[in-house]
Amino acid sequence: MNYIKVKGTYDVLPTEAENWVALESYVRKLFKTYNYGEIRTPMMEYSNVIHRETELSDMVIKETYNFKDKSDRDLTLRPEGTAGVIRSYVENKLYAQAGVTKLYYMGPNFRYERPQKGRFRQFMQFGCEVLGSNEPSIDAEVIELAYETIYRLGLKQVSVKLNSLGDDASKANYRQALIDFLTPVKDKLSKDSQDRLTHNPLRILDSKDTADIELIKNAPLPLDYLNETSKQHFDSVLELLNLMNIPYEIDRKLVRGLDYYAHTVFEIHATIKGFGAQNALGGGGRYQNLVKELGGPDTPGIGYAFGMERLLSALEQEGITLTSPKQLDVYFITFDQQSRKKAIQLQHILRSENILSDIDHLNRGFKPQLKEALRYDSKFIIIIGENELNNNVVQLKNTKTEEQVEVSMDTLLDTLKELL
């Protein structure tokens, strides 16, 4: 029997893991700069947290992993981060705290979709949710943070695409106008769009089907149905983005994929080799009713998410590295059991002072050990043989200059601290 990974998943090997750790560290540091606190929620939720009795997105309908536990309770692996964060916000009564709640998250999500390049059934996301304010300034800050996350990584021509769906009243008026426009040509729409016309008509604007694209060329658009309050909100967001010199483009057909969005929706784009027109790296938007739907008080929110696999792929395509080449500080070369025991003792002392060190564990000869030291690009090699043991010294060799000196075992730590 072959034991292989589950379809749509992947292994992160040690060389790749360093890139993941570097990106995670970068993201956490940036969120901290903006005064966001990390929240960690379970990877599975009771299904009613995900499958709420409102309009369901295509993703929730088709792509979630649902199962029953041994007590016959319905559970769902989280397909995205927002629902679990809001559930936790309500359950833990974070809304009782004064002021705005600013949260960020990072972790795996699960969707049963067709695996393809850049798309997986288990995938990593990071994102944020800001709860408790209707002010356009929060929209602008969240967009700023999303933009800066990508811009500071060094990707080219980073920009924001955004739109407004308006408040509930504006969105309802637009939704009906779109249904009225498309119903006469329903039979000409793709199968997916025909299904969406009933439960999620706004997503038809995002269709990639050529027939759909032609049919919606003259469709009504959300911006044309904004009431005065919604228009003022969107204008204020644009004004603040202008003040921060954040480049943006109004995309009148941008709706995003989740049904709870209202008012501002946005995506972050960058020019990336090989990505072509599919250069959106992440996005999000504002929501008005999600907290209330999950049992909390009437609380507005806004958030975004980025797929980490896609972002790491973009960095690789552009030749941007977040890590330095892996390099040991020292590598011990020994010749027998006694010298190996002494090396292990010395190595423990060095490691306790955060000096990166390793030793051979295969009882190999000098040449294989030397080859291993050079493979790890070790800065120094420490050689211990019978003579060194008898005299309580080591041979310390600089691999760059090839200079070799004799150092007392008692002063080895201090010597290395000076040299490293």
UniProtKB/Swiss-Prot annotation:
GO terms for biological process: histidyl-tRNA aminoacylation. Its main location: cytoplasm. It catalyses: tRNA(His) + L-histidine + ATP = L-histidyl-tRNA(His) + AMP + diphosphate + H(+). It comes from the Bacteria. The keyword Repeat does not apply. One of its GO terms (molecular function) is ATP binding. Signal peptide: none annotated. PANTHER family: HISTIDINE--TRNA LIGASE, MITOCHONDRIAL-RELATED, HISTIDYL-TRNA SYNTHETASE. This is Histidine--tRNA ligase. It comes from Acholeplasma laidlawii (strain PG-8A).
